[in-house]
Amino acid sequence: MKPGIHPDYHPVVFQDASTGTTFLTRSTLTSDRTAVWEDGNTYPLVVVDVTSESHPFWTGAQRVMDTAGRVEKFERRYGVRKRP
């Protein structure tokens, strides 16, 4: 690999916003927020909406996402279209 052209690849803690589950992995993402991991070290914290802990494919359970508000907002903005 050429030096100086690749982003920094470092340990990062990802947190599932809906379950609170945290994962320590490596990524090029950075964040101003930090978290202290089980090993006592401080790592950047990235909060994500969906992980394998909350996605219906991996959990096998249906989870209601907050799409009702988005649909209503879309209908208010563009109106409800009637089919012929």
Swiss-Prot record:
Protein family: Belongs to the bacterial ribosomal protein bL31 family. Type B subfamily.
NCBIfam families the record matches: L31, PRK01678.1
GO cellular component: ribonucleoprotein complex; ribosome
UniProt cross-references to InterPro entries, sorted A to Z: Ribosomal_bL28/bL31-like_sf (IPR034704), Ribosomal_bL31 (IPR002150), Ribosomal_bL31_B (IPR027493), Ribosomal_bL31_sf (IPR042105)
GO BP: any one term: translation
Gene transcribed to yield this protein: rpmE2
Keyword field: Ribonucleoprotein, Ribosomal protein
GO molecular function: structural constituent of ribosome
Presence of keyword Thylakoid: no
PROSITE patterns: RIBOSOMAL_L31 (PS01143)
Assembly behavior: Part of the 50S ribosomal subunit.
Pfam families, alphabetized: Ribosomal_L31
Superkingdom as given in the UniProt entry: Bacteria
Protein source organism: Rhodococcus opacus (strain B4)
PANTHER family, A to Z: 50S RIBOSOMAL PROTEIN L31, CHLOROPLASTIC, LARGE RIBOSOMAL SUBUNIT PROTEIN BL31C
Protein name: Large ribosomal subunit protein bL31B
